[in-house]
Amino acid sequence: MKTLQAKLSNKKNNFVPYIMAGDHERGLEGLNETIQLLEQAGSSAIEIGVPFSDPVADGPVIEQAGLRALAKNVSLSKILDSLKSIETEVPLVIMTYFNPVYQFGIENFVAALESTAVKGLIIPDLPKEHEAYIKPFITDKDICLVPLVSLTTPISRQKELVVDAEGFIYAVAINGVTGKENAYSNQLDHHLETLSKLTDIPVLTGFGISTLTDVERFNKVSAGVIVGSKIVRDLHENKESDVIKFIENAINF
């Protein structure tokens, strides 16, 4: 079992915060500081976004964070260089669109990851049918390709998506982009329970989670949550103490 999956399988109430690399007043020089803060608060893993000019899955908060990072000339190459010098016991997960990886060179990308604490990849615009672009390069590495599964996807398709998954399953709680609040289906709990029965891999719920009420709800029917827009917004507004308190409360339900 790879590190990311082992880490998330060991406990309930997993909390995975999302941050945008380079969205800091000191740009990438602030990345280590943010990772250490999130680790010390009790995060199970940390998702790190790569800024991209056409972020189809990102809501306005994360899209603006990406634009701020791009304005500081943050790139995938610079992010990977920064991560090489960061030591953390918490597995990192890179969230990137496929184009930056393709431009960087897939083999070079994976080789660079091996010099970092990155243990997982989320590529939202890479469908299951195209995973062969990535998987042959990470099969024997301690790196997982994490699938996103919409809870409105037919069960037959969900089975296809999770059959050989590693790390965790990213359950998309709403239709649309990240950060979209109060749009949860009444059937969501049932859908999460159904998805969890299809796999032994931890299922984490994300998209639109912004309150402790949301966290408590999803911790009951999945292995934990991924919180992006709220974390990105609070960090941008220099509310680090609020972030720490939110994570500490979230993991102690």
Curated annotation (Swiss-Prot):
Pathway the protein contributes to: Amino-acid biosynthesis; L-tryptophan biosynthesis; L-tryptophan from chorismate: step 5/5
GO cellular component, one term: cytosol
Pfam families in the record: Trp_syntA
Catalyzed reaction equations: (1S,2R)-1-C-(indol-3-yl)glycerol 3-phosphate + L-serine = D-glyceraldehyde 3-phosphate + L-tryptophan + H2O
Catalytic activity, EC: 4.2.1.20
UniProt keyword annotations, A-Z: Amino-acid biosynthesis, Aromatic amino acid biosynthesis, Lyase, Tryptophan biosynthesis
Residues annotated as catalytic: E47, D58
A GO term for molecular function: tryptophan synthase activity
Xref: CDD domains: Tryptophan_synthase_alpha
Bilayer-crossing regions: none
Major enzyme class: lyase
Self-association state and partner proteins as the record states: Tetramer of two alpha and two beta chains.
Recorded family membership: Belongs to the TrpA family.
Function: The alpha subunit is responsible for the aldol cleavage of indoleglycerol phosphate to indole and glyceraldehyde 3-phosphate.
Protein name: Tryptophan synthase alpha chain
